[in-house]
Amino acid sequence: MIVAQTLTDQDVDDPSQVGPLIDQIDEPIGRVTADGAYDGRPTYQTIAAHGDGITVVIPPRSTAVPSSEPGSPTQRDRHLAMIAEQGRMAWQAATEYGQRSLMETTMGRYKALIGPRLRARGFAAQQTEAAMGVAVLNRMLATGRPQSVHCLPVAA
């Protein structure tokens, strides 16, 4: 399910949209997962401003260094330490970073079902078209999603 969306022009960088996207979410946020393009202090600060207990899962860049802030290590610093100690693949497994692939799958569904490009010409109309596409996709996903129940095997 897509819980927030925005359409910007090519002059807007993705990390600058973290705040506006989070503002669209009415429910408590427990976790934010994003790709490495979002790595950086501004993203972490924006997320922290929206709630204290939000877990941030963003892979640090390969050139990342720990922050020089005094006090306890930041979430990003803990990610860097874990990667240094156990490796990037172990970090991905421990943080469940692989869940991000579900987001990529959803975007693939959008492009396959709604279309790979917008049809409207004006920017405001394109924003409306994108929002309508998200609403349609969410309705389709909700309709077709099975209600799964985890069952434990019965001992013989």
Regions found by a protein language model. Give the residues of each.
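Helix-centered, glycine/charged polyanion-binding patches within enzymatic domains
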Residues: 36-112, 120, 124
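A short, flexible helix-boundary coil/loop motif
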Residues: 80-86, 114-117, 142-156
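Short, residue-level hotspots on alpha-helical faces of the histone-fold
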Residues: 105-108, 134-138
